[in-house]
Amino acid sequence: MRRREFIGNLGVLGAAAGSTLFSRGSSALPVQKRPVIAWAGAPPAGAPAGVNVPQFILDLVYGNFVKGLAEFGYEHGRSVDVIKRFDMFSDRVATMEEMVALVKPDVIVAPATLQAVEARKATSTIPIVCGALADAVHLGLIGSEARPGGNVTGIEPYISGLPTNQIELAREIAPTARCLGLLTNMNDPKGPPQVEDLKAACQAIDLSVVEADANTPNDIPGALAALANKKVDVVVVLQTNLLLVRCEQIGAIALEKRLPTVFGYREHVIHGGLVSYGVDLRWCYRRTGYFVDKILRGAHPGDLPIEFPSKLWLAVNLKTAKALDVAIPAALLARGDEVIE
């Protein structure tokens, strides 16, 4: 869509809003003008403009955001208008500043911390909801988790203490392990806190640690090869945006190098990883609908506490276990929320 066409179409949004825009029984409030929600995510794979993400990530992130809106009675084109940043121009991704100026949204939804930081630089007044915040206090996005205080709020999908559980899981699948490999991504705000916690958990049980950092997709093969060359017994992969997006690549290389691998996100296991234990990102992105609803009803984002997932998700891929000749304990399988045959 060209810039002139896009601006022209924006003028039609409000005109399409007639009397009552919500179905009877909907929890959403009737309004005369449909609220506008700006989606600040990246474009899909194959898009002509800028960085793109695989379809399964769009389904995970944007798809569950849409489901979350629906839980509160909101539907694009009927009760709200959702404008995607990557749809604004045909040849590039709009900047956050352009999105704010042209769309004038009532709420901005940012998939992850990077987009939340960019959105916060573009506006200090429009509410911003983030589905996967990290290190938000240190980055100046919020004052505190209990009372954000500014225009940013949302969900933090990292739970302190989770690394200890992941190390315990690693020992379950590799009970004789003495050396653990860490595939890190230290330029992601979520990286350093995880590494610190994982190292502390390993030190507590006298498990040595070897790190290999990957900050671009091209770094991943070399990083996993380095861990294999160091003869690590099991690998823990950090929960970061890059390593999630590249989960298929990581799963394939780990299998090739015969590395039993523990992840934090179930999506890795769906795409060939061995086991995962961590938050369910599907819940995180559905939960953005709750925050959007609260804000559209008049709540200030600074008064909405940051939320954390209350349930952790255990996934096991038995096909990968068989290929790696790893015996998954029956007790672990019995605890599994998701077992891939």
Please state what every model-predicted region is:
Residues 1-341:
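Short hydrophobic alpha-helices and adjacent helix-cap/hinge residues
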